[in-house]
């Protein structure tokens, strides 16, 4: 496990990965080590065939090809590190074929579904309802990753024009790889956040100074609402808004934000910047989504009817 600790320290220092990415690497490596232990194998003496057996083992446990590929990528990077540190001379993952998978188009909500969700949330005037309304408005208005949303600080979104501050329409957020990007939000989001700020103190635990700095403070260890808690609240709101909670998640709201922008004529490069995608190919998935919608729309063309 010593080598794993060294590898994770290197990732943190040199690649500026997020905590969630580091945890993902750690889980993959520990799972791999547990498999090797059960097979009575040493990480420094395994063969490519051993790695192929491990991949078959993962597939036999119904792990999706995309997840298997991520694990393979983690282990490959780990062995590259071991070689660079002279712990071994051989990367057993180098000549392993990656399982093939189909790119699944992202699931999105229709604009009417978004409106239904926001309409329900805006009617709940309890402190919890006002907070959730602000969070959903902000997420759909900005396309933030859920980890970015819940960990926003007051200073990220407030100006210093007044003693209490005013809600910014434009602010910056630190995303994946510590890359800063500009976020623009609409007037409805500004209003919902301002309404929430008026009751925010309800959620502040003054005994825990750590949570004072966050926009959405919580008694959770990090000082802000957890991603999991927000996802649960979102699904609960969907249920009350007569929407299927199985088809609603923070990430689906992010997908909906991007897809609706594209539908409205926004440039793909602009959407890439707003989402914080390093590679335009990641954003291009939304063009395939639009093509799918167009094909479905064409089914209603009069010449397509018998």
UniProtKB/Swiss-Prot annotation:
Q: List the disulfide bonds.
A: none
Main location group: cytoplasm
Query: Which terms does the record give in the GO molecular function aspect?
Result: DNA binding; tyrosine-based site-specific recombinase activity
Q: Which residues form the Core-binding (CB) domain?
A: 1-83
> Which superkingdom heads the taxonomic lineage of this protein's source?
Bacteria
Q: Gene Ontology cellular component?
A: cytoplasm
Active site residues per record:
145, 176, 251, 254, 277, 286 (o-(3'-phospho-dna)-tyrosine intermediate)
Q: Which UniProt keywords apply?
A: Cell cycle, Cell division, Chromosome partition, Cytoplasm, DNA integration, DNA recombination, DNA-binding
Database matches in CDD domains: INT_XerDC_C
Per the UniProt entry, what are the Gene Ontology biological process annotations, in alphabetical order? cell division; chromosome segregation; DNA transposition
Q: Which Pfam families match?
A: Phage_int_SAM_1, Phage_integrase
Would the keyword DNA-binding be found if you checked this record's keyword annotation?
A: yes
Subunit info here reads: Forms a cyclic heterotetrameric complex composed of two molecules of XerC and two molecules of XerD.
- Extract the PANTHER family matched here: PHAGE INTEGRASE-RELATED, TYROSINE RECOMBINASE XERC
- List, alphabetically, the NCBIfam families matched: PRK00283.1
Describe its function: Site-specific tyrosine recombinase, which acts by catalyzing the cutting and rejoining of the recombining DNA molecules. The XerC-XerD complex is essential to convert dimers of the bacterial chromosome into monomers to permit their segregation at cell division. It also contributes to the segregational stability of plasmids.
Into which family does the record put it?
Belongs to the 'phage' integrase family. XerD subfamily.
Q: What protein name does the entry list?
A: Tyrosine recombinase XerD
């Amino acid at each position: 496990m010593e080598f794993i600790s060294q590898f994770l320290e290197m990732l943190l220092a040199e690649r500026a990965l997020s905590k969630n990415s580091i945890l993902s690497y750690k889980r993959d490596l520990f799972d791999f080590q547990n498999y090797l232990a059960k097979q009575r194998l040493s990480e420094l003496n395994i063969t490519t065939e051993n790695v192929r057996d491990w991949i078959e083992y993962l597939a036999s446990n119904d792990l999706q090809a995309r997840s298997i590929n991520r694990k393979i990528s983690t282990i490959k990077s780990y062995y590259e590190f071991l070689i660079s540190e002279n712990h071994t001379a051989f990367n057993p993952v180098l000549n392993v074929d990656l399982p093939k998978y189909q790119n699944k188009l992202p699931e999105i909500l229709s604009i009417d579904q978004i409106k239904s969700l926001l309409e329900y949330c805006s009617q709940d005037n309890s402190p919890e309802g006002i907070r959730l309304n602000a969070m959903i408005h902000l997420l759909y208005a900005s396309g933030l990753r859920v980890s970015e949303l819940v960990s926003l600080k007051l200073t990220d979104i407030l100006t210093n024009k007044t003693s209490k501050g005013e809600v910014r329409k434009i602010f910056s957020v630190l995303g994946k790889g510590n890359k800063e990007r500009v976020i623009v939000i609409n007037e409805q989001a500004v209003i919902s956040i301002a309404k929430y700020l008026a009751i925010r103190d309800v959620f502040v635990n003054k005994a825990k100074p750590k949570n004072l700095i966050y926009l959405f403070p919580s008694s959770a260890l990090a000082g802000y609402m957890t991603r999991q808690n927000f996802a649960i609240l979102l699904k609960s709101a969907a249920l009350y808004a007569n929407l299927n909670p199985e088809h609603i998640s923070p990430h689906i709201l992010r997908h909906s934000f991007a897809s609706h922008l594209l539908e409205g004529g926004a440039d793909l490069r602009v959407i890439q910047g707003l989402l914080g995608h390093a590679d335009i190919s990641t954003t291009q998935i939304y063009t395939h989504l639009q093509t799918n919608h167009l094909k479905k729309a064409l089914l209603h063309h009069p010449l397509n009817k018998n």
